[in-house]
Structure formats: structure tokens, C-alpha cells
Amino acid sequence: AAAQQKETAAAAGGGATVSGYDVGGLYLSGPNAGYRSELPPAQFMEWGKPTVGGHALSWHPLAGKNGNPTPGFRATPYPPRPIAFVPFPGNPHDNNHTPGVLPLSWVNMCEFMCNRLSQCLGDEYSRFDVSTSSRSPAFDLAFTTRVLSVTGMESEPGNNKWYNVDCNPGTGTMIAEFDCPADAWFLEGSSRGDLMPYSILMEIALQTCGVLTTWNKAPLTLARTCDRDNILFRNLDATAKLLRNVDLRGKTIRNESTATGYSMLGEMGVQKFKTKLTIDGGEPFYEVDSSFGWFIPEVFEKQIGLDNGKTTPAWHLIPKNAGPQPVVYALPTEEARIFSKVAGAHSLQRRSAQCGYLDKVSFIANSGMHGKGYAHGHKTVDVKDWFFSCHFWCDAVMPGSLGVESMHQAMELFSVNQGLADGIANPSFEHDRGVTKWKYRGQLTPKNKVLECEVHIKKVERAAGGVTVVADGFLLVDSLRVYSTTDLRIRIVPGAASAAAV
């Protein structure tokens, strides 16, 4: 039977389809460990239970190998995806899997992402095991490989004087790591192989904050104060500074995040952090000051966005802003029209659909809030969008970072459409160093219908052999503005400049 199952998996190319979803990345534990599963839907939906052949499903290819435990699944309305990342071999911090004991390994993080929180952080968190509380992002967005240490926490065991917990959630520094493969999906899909999309930088920086706030018992403050187990964690604001462009292929990225404050406002907890990213023991290359909130779900039943609940059409459709009608390009089918007049355009194009977040884009020159150009992006929301399985496993919501990435995509396409790459040999995009800010006051879930983004160009500067483009932006969900961004930054540089990444 085992041999037959191996042959079936091989013949199927490791793929399986359940209700229209590709779930070919599941792996078998037990005697068939390492072979991708080919299971009929009725068996597949028994997540975590033995199949007819007596093998349990796991979402991680290291499960059950070399004495490794098998992380569990919890069934949700969304199917799991193929595992995108595995730890680099030989790291001594990956051998201990004891819940609540540092370091936290990839096994603990798998449990945090898709199963029982207590199997990552210990029995005190068991009240969240069967809840829909926010988890650490999973699958393609699982950017915390391991947690090495937590220091500097203020605590008094047994004395619940900090909002009903015995440690101060606003203290402590966590060191975590992400092992970034050289062929990561986001590197393979970006316009060049050494360019990590800005959204992924954001996620790598912010995800450790989610682990630290949970380790610091912030969700327990809300759970115990409000007697609620289903609570949601959301980024509210951030100021980020890119200090230098770094080639992160095949690198272990170290995240140092420090909690700088925590307060409760009724049925909401607000947490602040300072984060820096480094590699190879070097100086930081990306720094973020951020704030997050813990909420009860009812807060989002009627979100009010940035404008106190008032909906609005996109900027170019507001009568007072009437002007030339933009030409609309369907993506990706008409993307070639945008790039057709650019020499070396292939080096500017995103290389995979997964790295694109828009299905339409349009531009107006010399327009927008700053009079220097305007881009509008559109996406019809699909309940099968890949990121809903990843973020979060028990609480499906589009990552704010991908909303920001949709603005970056619109900026890139605007820049090409307006000829800003003309005269640059083998042009390519890179991130412009400097400060970018964002604010989130709402969310996009599978229940929503339409995402729109606006990009308002505020600076176009030719210098140092390249072109710098800076813009402000907004994201609308069903005509409600929910995100704002300040100073989105990209550069167009000659192809040879890609060697400057160190």
C-alpha cells in the first residue's frame, strides 16, 4: 500500500485539488514521510486525523523525520498551502521543541501558526487553542523561523498587577530569525532576483512583534479582563526607515524587537515596538517603530476607516477633481502595452502573478493631490486569494503589507508608463532609502468585494544615474478608505547598479 501511494503521488506530480484549491504541498508523516499526498476530498478534510492508510497529514516536510515531532492542524474554512520555507540545516536552536521554553523552534512556530497556541507558548495559553484568535502568519508568509531569546521583561510571578497578568506586556526584547532561501517565491517573482518586495521587508520586521506581544501575555490581558477568547491582533501605524539595500538571498535575517509600551483602552489593548533587522552580525538595514492593537471581533463588524465611516469614490472620480479620463489597462493581459516602448522592459516586470496584487491599473499625468501624477489600481476580491490561508490561519484577512505592495506595483507601472525609465540602460527597480509611514484603520476580508489603491506622486527626481519616485497613497475597501501611506519610495537604476546590493 505504501509503495502504491508513493507511485500515486509521483504520477500526480505531487498535486491534489480540493474544491478548486491546489493543495499539492501536503506531506505524509509516518512510513511515507516526505511523499506528497494525493487524497480524495473526504479524506483530506479530516485534517490531522489518520487517513485510510493510517498516516496523519502534516503541512511541514520535516515532520516525523529524524525524530522530529509532527506539528498539528486545526481545520478552518481555508485549505492549507504548500510549505514555502524550511529552516537552514544545522542550526543548534532548532532541536528543542518544548512549549514555552526558549528557544522556540520551527515546530513551536508551526503550532503557533496553524494549531494549538499552548504547544508553542505553554499551558497558560490553552484557552486560545480552539479559538479563532490571530496567529502568526503561515505558509507563504511564515517569516519567523525561530525565536532565540527574550530579555528585559518586567515580571513578578504570581502577582497579576499588569492588567491581570504577572508580567508587563510593554517590556522585553525578543531576538528572532528568518532563514530566507535564495529561491524564495517573492524573490523569484519580483522584477529582479535580489530585490525583496517592500511588503516582505515589512512582514519580516513586524511578525516578531506579534510573537513578542503574545509571549508577553498581552492577549491574556484582554481575555481575562473581557472574558473573551476570540481576539484579533492588528497593526495600526508604523514609521519605517530603509537604511541600505541588502542582498538577502540565502541569508538568516535577525530581528530584534523591543516592546516600548502597553496600555488598555476599554476592550482594546495597544502595544508599541521598536524593531531592527540585521544580517551576519552587521549594522541594521531596516528599522521600524510600530503600534498594534488587540481587539474583540465586534470592533470590525462595522469598520469606519479613515473617514469616520464615510465612503468615497476614488480620487479621480470625485467631481472636483475631474480631468482627463485615464486609460485603463487590464492586468496581466495588457501589461505588455505598458512596457512595449521601454528598452529592456523585461528587467522592470514582476515575474509571477503571486507578486502582483492588481487586476486593473490606470494613470493620469500631472494629476493627483500633488499635481505630479496619479495612478489608480483595482482588484476584485476572490475568497480563494492565496493570502487568506496564510494570514491568519484562524482569522482570514489580507495583510496590510500587501495593500501597501499594491501601491508599489501601481507606482512601478506609472513610472514605466510615463517614460521615467527612458534613457536608463537595462533599467531595474530598487527601494529608495529613507522613511516611509503607514496607517491602518480597517481591513480587507473574504467578505469584501473590491480593493482600490491610489498613488499620488509627490516627487520625481533624476540624480546619480537613476530616477527616484516618491508618492503618498490610500487603499480603499468597498469605497471606504482604510489605509494611508506617506512617502512610498522607489528608484529606477541602471542594471549594473544591482551589484551595489551588499
Q: What spans do the regions from the language model cover?
A:
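Short, structured beta-strand/loop micro-motifs enriched in basic residues and often containing a Trp
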Residues: R234-T239, D432-W438
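Hydrophobic, ordered structural segments
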Residues: E283-P284
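Well-ordered mid-protein domain cores that form the structural environment of catalytic cofactors
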Residues: W215-A218, T225, A238-L243, R441
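Substrate-binding beta-hairpin/strand module that engages nucleic acids
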Residues: L222-L232, L420-R433
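Short tryptophan-centered beta-strand motifs in secreted/extracellular beta-sheet-rich domains
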Residues: I253-A259, L451-I457
